[in-house]
């Protein structure tokens, strides 16, 4: 039942321009106009969120959104969501509780006038559901969806803002159970905004916007806040960024020495040293790196991002945020004040964006950094600059790691987009800034009509730059070896608006502050040829900017103990130790320097509401969607894709769907009977003599470890009744099922290889059209084979004898060791189209045994 929409009153007030929203928030806390909580030595804000965007190329402020009053606080822990009414908005909070209880009655487990507890168990991940059904099943994200969809007559409201922990992934995917560590951020914590402040810095304008069912109280609160903002704007004080942030200090060449002078300590006065202590020592972290490399060699992952933390005192998190904002302005600046913790950061990298205006979702991976070619006087030496760009573009390791992240982003966007709309709008563009240049790509797609922005966000969790690939196996390794929850680190901060606008950033270059101490976490991207000591040093480089901001906020300089050798002559990030140009490799947990967001980039800046967006009254009730795009007449070739927990599965799905075929996705953790049932021809298919095609996806590890994979392949080979194509791990499963063996052939990840098409391949339906020219293919594997069993014929091999493609001599079974779906395989779509079309050709023998009858 859809409840009668609440009729909130909307109040807007143009107010005096506040150039520094962080200082304004401090002022409002002192005057009691925002929620506050007492901590030793001060009163700090609570239940507020500050989101800011800074153009770091010019250091000009762009946009600020501040949640000054919230109606409710939503906290997710596991499958439980607690919704609490906040004291400054009791009427609105009570209305929200009533709306949620009415819309989600089956999930209510406890209710008082001040609190509602919901339980939303996750959809099973045992493979029993087709993947689209699983993605759109009810989840703990439903309360956010429903509150954001309430009808308010204003483009900026309704709005929910907050943080998703890295560990939110474990609420809908099976990850090892680990204890809570120093970062106690819940799975998510969001606020339903009642009054927000929107600041447009380029026009030096600001507006208070509020919505409430208690119009009189809202008018009074907005008027109080307007007067306070005007009073604050008239206070004398240092000029802060209406157009430019203060110029940051030069990068230090190493840990500061006791007794060195420091700003704020007076001329010649020594600054105290504040020591940051690592949560994991050098030797232990290097051992973690080596363990990760063993997993890479075993074919479990292509890359993985372990992390460690650094702790130091932090009595005033908002002061630390101010220091970070001035020294390291970034596209995504954030400060979140919750009852038990504060979270601050300056992130350079978006997580997932959804534009309500265009209906597009986008991911922008950043990986690969070089210094600008600066001359002795600090100006750009264009000749040197060009040489450094060429070095960046041609560095095999940089390019391979960047391509891996691009293929991963293509997968995540394809999973939630209309087939055929996913595209790489920028591939390895070199963006230049004042001190560094980066490789940047962008992947966009049109969001599928049966999904919304929150579905897309869950489908893309977590970002590959903080996890690795394949994501799920990498996340399992991260949890097992780090041994505790990551909390906010590697999660996302941002907002969701009523029209569906979603703007989130990755929580990196951040500090989690609780009980007077800051925890700053940083990771290192581990690949096969990583140097463990250098990866440990990389975490120091990445944490330093935030640690220095925390120290400066206390009038101190930073000490950080052991300094390991540099990972690269140009170590990562704008904030590195020992790099006067602030340059680096920064391929994971990006530490880019200045980046100017594109006009459509969110960067915590509100974009215009979509003029054709549906109103909240048109929003469907939860649960609201099921299944894949239907094929009512049963005319399309049907492909049943077995997902072996890979991060490129939806690149295959999108490619197959653009060929006009219907795709159903089941996880390899499904019972074999579930997949066998999906492979049975429908009556319409039987009438046309058509059989579904089984597609075996890539995946981590050995084929024998991937659920029902081997059982299905053995049956397909034995019966010859199921046309089958295997990719990478799927190819290896075919080799094993036919009596061959796969083993280590050396890690090759994100690399293009030129292969030789054999005589059999030149006659094969899939490869014959391409046999006249070179065949360049993408490889992501550590396992493979150089010797095929008698039942398989090689179609393509590498120069060192690794088999890249093979076909069964009798059964309609073909395997590709390479990845046709990758951007590195130019002829991949043509190969897959020819292959699946050939396998799906109608047959006349309707008496062939079914796969079900053999098992």
Each model region followed by its residue ranges:
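A glycine-centered loop/beta-turn motif at secondary-structure junctions
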Residues: 788, 799-846
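Cysteine-nucleophile active-site neighborhood
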Residues: 678, 690-769, 776, 827
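Catalytic beta-strand/loop cores that center a nucleophilic Ser/Cys/Thr
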Residues: 491, 762-810
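N-terminal beta1-alpha1 cap of cysteine-dependent amidohydrolase-like domains
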Residues: 236, 372, 549-710, 715-718, ...
């Amino acid at each position: 039942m859809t409840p009668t929409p609440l009729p909130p009153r909307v109040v807007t007030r143009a107010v005096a321009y506040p150039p520094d929203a962080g200082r304004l928030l401090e002022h409002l806390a002192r005057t009691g106009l925002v929620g506050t909580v007492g901590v030793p030595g001060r009163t700090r804000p609570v239940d507020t969120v500050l989101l800011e965007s800074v153009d770091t190329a010019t250091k000009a402020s762009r946009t600020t959104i501040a949640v000054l009053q919230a109606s409710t606080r939503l906290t997710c822990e596991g499958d439980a969501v607690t919704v609490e009414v906040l004291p400054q908005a009791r009427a609105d909070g009570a209305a929200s509780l009533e709306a949620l209880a009415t819309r989600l009655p089956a999930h209510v487990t406890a209710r008082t006038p001040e609190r509602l507890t919901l339980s939303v168990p996750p959809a099973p991940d045992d493979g029993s559901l087709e993947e689209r059904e699983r993605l759109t099943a009810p989840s703990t994200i439903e309360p956010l969806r429903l509150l954001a969809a309430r009808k308010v007559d204003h483009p900026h409201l309704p709005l929910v803002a907050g943080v998703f922990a890295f560990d939110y992934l474990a609420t809908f995917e099976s990850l090892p159970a680990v204890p809570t560590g120093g970062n106690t951020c819940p799975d998510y914590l969001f606020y339903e905004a009642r009054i927000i402040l929107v600041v447009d810095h380029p026009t030096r304008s600001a507006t208070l916007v509020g919505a409430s069912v208690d119009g009189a109280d809202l008018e009074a609160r907005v008027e109080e806040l307007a007067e306070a903002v005007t009073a604050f704007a008239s206070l004398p004080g240092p000029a802060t960024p209406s157009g430019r942030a203060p110029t940051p200090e030069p990068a230090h060449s190493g840990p500061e020495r006791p007794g060195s002078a420091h700003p704020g300590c007076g001329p010649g006065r020594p600054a105290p040293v504040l020591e940051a202590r690592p949560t994991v020592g050098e030797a232990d972290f290097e051992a973690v790196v080596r363990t990760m490399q063993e997993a890479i060699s075993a074919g479990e992952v292509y890359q993985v991002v372990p992390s460690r933390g650094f702790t130091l005192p932090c009595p005033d998190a908002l002061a630390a945020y101010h220091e970070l904002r001035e020294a390291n302005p970034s596209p995504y600046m954030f400060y979140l004040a919750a009852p038990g913790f504060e979270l601050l950061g300056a992130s350079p990298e978006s997580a997932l964006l959804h534009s309500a205006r265009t209906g597009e979702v986008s991911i922008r991976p950043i990986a690969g950094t070089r210094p600008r070619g600066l001359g002795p006087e600090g100006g750009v030496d264009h000749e040197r600059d060009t040489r450094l760009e060429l070095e960046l573009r041609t560095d095999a390791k940089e390019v391979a790691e960047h391509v891996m992240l691009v293929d991963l982003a293509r997968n995540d966007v394809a999973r939630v987009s209309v087939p055929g709309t996913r595209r790489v709008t920028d591939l390895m563009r070199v963006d230049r800034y004042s001190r560094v240049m980066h490789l940047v790509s962008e992947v966009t797609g049109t969001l599928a009509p049966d999904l919304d922005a929150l579905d897309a966000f869950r489908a893309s969790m977590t970002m590959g730059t903080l996890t690795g690939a394949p994501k799920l196996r990498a996340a399992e390794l991260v949890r097992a070896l780090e041994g505790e929850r990551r909390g906010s680190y590697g999660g996302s901060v941002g907002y969701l608006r009523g029209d569906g606008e979603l703007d989130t950033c990755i929580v990196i270059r951040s500090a989690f502050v609780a009980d007077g101490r800051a925890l700053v976490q940083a990771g290192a991207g581990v690949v096969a040829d990583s140097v463990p000591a250098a990866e440990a040093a990389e975490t120091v480089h990445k944490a330093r900017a935030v640690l220095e901001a925390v120290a400066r906020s206390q009038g101190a300089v930073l000490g950080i103990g052991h300094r390991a050798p540099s990972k690269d002559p140009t170590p990562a990030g704008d904030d590195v130790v020992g790099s006067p140009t602030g340059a680096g490799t920064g391929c994971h947990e990006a530490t880019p320097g200045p980046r100017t967001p594109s006009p459509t980039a969110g960067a915590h800046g509100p974009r215009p509401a979509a003029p054709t967006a549906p109103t909240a009254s048109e929003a469907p009730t939860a649960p609201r969607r099921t299944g894949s795009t239907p094929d009512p007449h049963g005319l399309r070739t049907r492909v049943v894709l077995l997902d072996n927990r890979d991060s490129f599965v939806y690149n295959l799905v999108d490619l197959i769907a653009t060929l006009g075929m219907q795709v159903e996705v089941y996880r390899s953790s499904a019972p074999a009977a579930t997949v066998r049932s999906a492979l049975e021809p429908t009556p319409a298919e039987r009438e046309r003599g058509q059989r579904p095609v089984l597609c075996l996806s890539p995946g981590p590890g050995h084929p024998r470890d991937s659920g029902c994979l081997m059982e299905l392949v053995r049956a397909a080979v034995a019966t010859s009744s199921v046309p089958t194509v295997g990719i990478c791990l799927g190819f290896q499963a075919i080799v094993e099922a036919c009596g061959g063996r796969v083993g280590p052939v050396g890690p090759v990840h994100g690399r293009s290889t030129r292969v030789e098409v054999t005589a059999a391949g030149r006659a094969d339906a899939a490869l014959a059209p391409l046999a006249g020219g070179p065949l360049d293919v993408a490889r992501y594997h550590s396992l493979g084979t150089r010797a095929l069993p008698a039942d398989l014929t090689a179609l393509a091999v590498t120069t060192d004898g690794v088999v890249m493609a093979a076909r069964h001599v009798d059964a309609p079974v073909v395997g590709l060791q390479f990845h046709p779906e990758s951007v590195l395989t130019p002829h991949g779509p043509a190969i897959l189209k020819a292959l699946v079309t050939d396998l799906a050709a109608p047959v006349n023998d309707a008496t062939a045994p079914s796969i079900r009858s053999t098992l």
